[in-house]
Regions:
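Primary recognition of N-terminal secretory signal peptides and signal-anchoring hydrophobic helices
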Residues: 2-182
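Bacterial extracytoplasmic/cell-wall-associated proteins, especially those involved in peptidoglycan
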Residues: 165-294
Length: 294
């Protein structure tokens, strides 16, 4: 009788152990499947790796999409600092704060990121793939003050850790340049895409650097050497409060981003009162309602 009970207990124990091991295996399989399942990257994207100080740190997490390298925001940030993340569903933006002093704001579908007062153009928009924000790597590297190079033989991005705190210094734009550049961009290109507004800002700054024009933003805008250069000066709209997007575009231009270092003119062919530019200057490209010329 006792032997029979012992056998029954052993049988129940074996069945329990088998069920337990089966459950553990199932849970492990599900966990591994979740970990191994890839993000639903867009068609045409190509995987690439990211190295930090010679070590592979992002393997299989990054892709080149439309000729731009995208990295997962959270994983990239945590490479350099102990960061906190706060998601705002209303604005579709993530606020990242690092112990090194960085405040970073990244908004889904935006073409720029905010970092300690700076506005860095991303070229490609911030993407949301499978519930995670992916950001072009170059502006993120600038935000963390990280050196970045492209290794053609490896077809990978190589990063070098910052010597100091992993955070760009707080922005300090020239107040006069920002004041007038944002106003001319807004007066000339309000309602245009951010890229179109940046291009107008590029024209002004390219003239500042040219020997053929005054060497200040204010001087270029109010230049009357060959007549009024910008119609908002005549209409008085240059003095209007600029649109928020124009202020951002001006800051991006002052960060040094340019669509072209050669463009010196632009016009809206639909409303232009003169075709001198189109007849005398080489055409460069069109963005929105504006044609740009060298």
């Amino acid at each position: 009788m006792i032997t029979r009970k012992i056998k029954e207990r052993r049988g129940r124990a074996r069945r329990w152990l088998a069920a337990f091991l089966s459950s553990v295996f199932l849970i492990s399989a599900l966990t591994l499947g979740a970990a191994a399942s890839s993000v639903a990257y867009p068609k045409g994207s190509v995987p690439t790796d990211v190295y930090l100080d010679g070590a592979l740190v992002l393997d299989g997490d990054c892709v080149i999409y439309n000729s731009i390298t995208y990295v997962p925001l959270r994983k990239f940030c945590n490479l350099f600092d102990d960061c906190t993340f706060e998601w705002n569903g209303k604005t579709g933006s993530a606020t990242v704060k690092g112990e090194g002093g960085l405040t970073l704001i990244v908004r889904q579908n935006a073409a720029y990121i905010y970092a300690n007062g700076h506005y860095f153009y991303t070229v490609g928009k911030v993407e949301n793939w499978s519930g995670s924000l992916f950001v072009p790597i170059r502006p993120l590297a600038r935000a963390f003050d990280v050196a970045l190079t492209w290794n053609a033989s490896r077809r990978a991005v190589e990063l070098i850790s910052p010597k100091g705190a992993p955070a760009v210094k707080w922005a300090s734009y020239d107040s006069d340049d920002l004041y007038w550049l944002s106003r001319i961009i807004s007066a000339e290109a309000r309602g245009e895409s951010l890229e179109g507004q940046i291009a107008v800002g590029n024209v002004v700054l390219n003239r500042v650097r040219s020997k053929s024009y005054p060497n200040t933003v204010y001087g270029v805008i109010f230049d009357r050497k060959h007549g009024t250069q910008f119609s908002p000066v005549s209409y008085g709209t240059i003095y209007n409060t600029p649109a928020e997007s124009s202020v951002i575009a001006a800051k991006i231009c002052l960060e040094g981003y340019t669509l072209s270092e050669d463009i010196l003119f632009f016009m809206n062919p639909r409303i232009a009162t003169s075709n001198w530019i189109s007849k005398n200057r080489p055409f460069a490209f069109r963005i929105g309602n504006h044609d740009f010329y060298k």
